[in-house]
Amino acid sequence: MAAVSGVRWLTRALVSAGNPGAWRGLSTSAAAHAASRSQAEDVRVEGSFPVTMLPGDGVGPELMHAVKEVFKAAAVPVEFQEHHLSEVQNMASEEKLEQVLSSMKENKVAIIGKIHTPMEYKGELASYDMRLRRKLDLFANVVHVKSLPGYMTRHNNLDLVIIREQTEGECSSLEHESARGVIECLKIVTRAKSQRIAKFAFDYATKKGRSKVIAVHKANIMKLGDGLFLQCCEEVAELYPKIKFETMIIDNCCMQLVQNPYQFDVLVMPNLYGNIIDNLAAGLVGGAGVVPGESYSAEYAVFETGARHPFAQAVGRNIANPTAMLLSASNMLRHLNLEYHSSMIADAVKKVIKVGKVRTRDMGGYSTTTDFIKSVIGHLHPHGS
C-alpha cells in the first residue's frame, strides 16, 4: 500500500533530518506528523510520493492546475504522473485506459477529474469512467458533506457522510433491446457486494466516531434486489451493537434531506441512489464546487470531487471553484500520512472561505479561479504555529 510505503519513507526522512531517536516511542500517526514537519523544512530529504493524476474533462484540467500550484507553494513531496483520458476529446482508447490503469496499480493512489460520458450510444455501454472503477474494484465511494465555516446556506453546521456501492446496481451497463421498441436494463445486486459495502460503512462509522448508519433503499418496490441489500445491511448491523441502525426509503430520504438534514450521520446505499443523493446533499452546503469525495478498493484510493460534474460551460473562463478538489487533495495527503501538509492546505482553503473576500461565482462572489488559488497560497502556513 502507498500509505505504508509512505510511513517507511517518513521514517527515513525523520532520521535523515537529524532525529535518529525520535521515531522510538512515537505512534505511527504521531511519528508521521513529526516527520511531515521535517519535510516542510526540507522536502528533498529523500524522494517523493508518486500519485497518478487524471485531469478529466470540463474544468478538470483547471482544477488540477490549482492542486499543482498549491502543492508547489506548500512544498508537498508528491510527484504527479499525469495521464489524459477523455471520451469527448478523442483522447480515449484501450491503450490509454491500460496506461492509466497501470499507473494507478503501481502508485495505489490517484487524483482524478470527471471523465465526461457522452449521451449517444456508440457501440459501448460501459463508459471509461465506469470501466476504470470496475477494473480497480473501487467499490466504495465516500462523500463527506460538511458546512464550510463562514459560508452561510439554508442549512448550516451540517456534517453527514454518504457511502455508496459503485460497482453494481443499476449502473451495471447491462442493457439490451429484447423486442423492437422494448429496452431492458438489468440491475445487479449481490450478497457479497452488499455485505462488503455495509461492513465498509459500519467500519467507517466506528473509525470516525459516528453514531448512526442509515441504509437507504427501495425494498418496498424492488423486494428482491433492494430487499437483499437491506437484508445484508441488517445482518452486518448486528455485528456493531454500538452503532445505531435505521432504514429509510430513497424517496423519503430525498425529502428528509431537504427538510431536516441534521438527522443524518452516515448513509449507505446502492449505486444509483448514491449518485443522486451525493448531488442533492452537495447542494445543501454550496454545490458541486465545495464537496470532496473519494473511492476505495482493498488496494487503491482515488480522490475526486464529491459531486462529479465536468462544468463544461465554464471551461477557459477562469471561474471554476477549486475548493472541492483542493479539499480532496488534502484528504489524499492525509491518506499518505502527510498530515502536516494535509492540514496546512485544508486550513488555508477554509480560511479563504471564512474571510469571505475571495469567492468564486458559484459561492456568490466575483473572484476568478486564479484569485482563489493565490488567496489559498497566501494563507498557507505551518499548521499549529
Swiss-Prot record:
GO terms for molecular function: magnesium ion binding; NAD binding; oxidoreductase activity, acting on the CH-OH group of donors, NAD or NADP as acceptor. The keyword Repeat does not apply. The heterotetramer and the heterodimer composed of IDH3A and IDH3G subunits can be allosterically activated by citrate (CIT) or/and ADP, and the two activators can act independently or synergistically. The heterodimer composed of IDH3A and IDH3B subunits cannot be allosterically regulated and the allosteric regulation of the heterotetramer is through the IDH3G subunit and not the IDH3B subunit. Its main location: mitochondrion. The keyword Ion transport does not apply. Keywords: Acetylation, Mitochondrion, Transit peptide, Tricarboxylic acid cycle. It is found in: Mitochondrion. InterPro entries: IsoCit/isopropylmalate_DH_CS, Isocitrate_DH_NAD, IsoPropMal-DH-like_dom. It comes from the Eukaryota. One of its GO terms (biological process) is tricarboxylic acid cycle. Residues 1-34 form a transit peptide. The modification N6-acetyllysine is found at K199. GO terms for cellular component: mitochondrion. Signal peptide: none annotated. NCBIfam families: mito_nad_idh. Plays a structural role to facilitate the assembly and ensure the full activity of the enzyme catalyzing the decarboxylation of isocitrate (ICT) into alpha-ketoglutarate. The heterodimer composed of the alpha (IDH3A) and beta (IDH3B) subunits and the heterodimer composed of the alpha (IDH3A) and gamma (IDH3G) subunits, have considerable basal activity but the full activity of the heterotetramer (containing two subunits of IDH3A, one of IDH3B and one of IDH3G) requires the assembly and cooperative function of both heterodimers. This is Isocitrate dehydrogenase [NAD] subunit beta, mitochondrial. The gene is IDH3B.
